[in-house]
Amino acid sequence: MLLASLIALLAGATGPLGLRTQGTLRELFLDVTAADARPLARPELDLRWSLANDWNEPMQLARHDDRALQYLDEQADSLTASYRAPWPRLPWIWTAVEGRLTEHWGGWSDRPIEAWHRLTGAFNYQREAFPRDQLRLLYADSGGVAFDLRSARLAVGDLVARTQATVLQGAPGAVALRFDLKAPTGLLSRLGGSGGFDLGGGVLGTVLLAPWAALHGLVALSHFGELSAPTRLQPKPWHWSFEGSLALSFGETVVLIEDRCLSPLLPPGWQRLPGGGDDGILSSGLYAGFRVHNQVSAGVRRGRFAVWASEDFTPGPNPHSTIQWIWVSNAPDFVLGLSFTQPL
């Protein structure tokens, strides 16, 4: 019992944040999230709030005779509840059930983001040419309309079940296998979910570098179902993701630095129709939908509470920008979050 309590204490204190990659389109699908590879000693309830500001100006796409329109401008505030517990007779396996409510609205975060851009001299992605704190979400093409929102909506999200089994464990760390499943309980028209089933699997590792440092990793492969709308532009069926998390303990405070990288959401073959020059390309959803997405996060955990912030910076060629070795998708542009975890 003492050993189990110690494992729970260490895993809870130095485990990764378990973040998903937010954003209007990515949130519709399953995201295999990181976790400590060591067993879970007791049930726990995790409650979290997060804010994601998305900004992609109107974009027109073409593939042969097909045409598509995208416009993603919102603040999404999410409340997520997750209950996870070890199996009674197989304590090295745990299962979690996760549900989410999201308010899609104009929010308040546009002005602080623009102020930060002015302060740092960063490119403002043509935000100043559009109304602040507005909601406008459109995904449509020659085949149909997936969503078209002009006013705030509260959306019930898809239900997610996650099961993880520790297969190797020793003094320096552990290795675990994971299987996740998403069921379509949310409505696509309200941006609650994709309207289809998704599944994913992954390998997780945890290494104790020192009594005050832990390193976590995740490699995952997922299969996405199609959007429930008859749009021509559908997600790629297969997706990979990589994630790394470094947890550094300073007394009762844990500082976390994380990086997660996801494959492109949408398939190749579509071209953005010209307009707006280089600034128009950078401000559109081209990179968000058709390129790899890399999210960098920093967080602090103390006791049962954790706070974090995330930005997307993806290394790679970007000839349309003055900084040509990195790109930013702005989907989301910025994320803030707060979580409370209660052992049961």
Regions found by a protein language model. Give the residues of each.
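Surface-exposed strand-loop-strand hairpins of Gram-negative outer-membrane beta-barrel proteins
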Residues: 15-21, 38-39, 48-78, 147, ...
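Hydrophobic, lipid-facing positions within transmembrane beta-strands of outer-membrane proteins
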Residues: 28, 43, 75-81, 157-163, ...
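Membrane-embedded beta-strand positions of outer-membrane beta-barrel proteins
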Residues: 45-49, 95-97, 163, 175-179, ...
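Outer-membrane beta-barrel channels and translocator barrels
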Residues: 40-42, 88-93, 102, 168-172, ...
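Outer-membrane beta-barrel biogenesis signature
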Residues: 6-48
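Outer membrane beta-barrel transmembrane domains
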Residues: 59, 117-147, 230-344
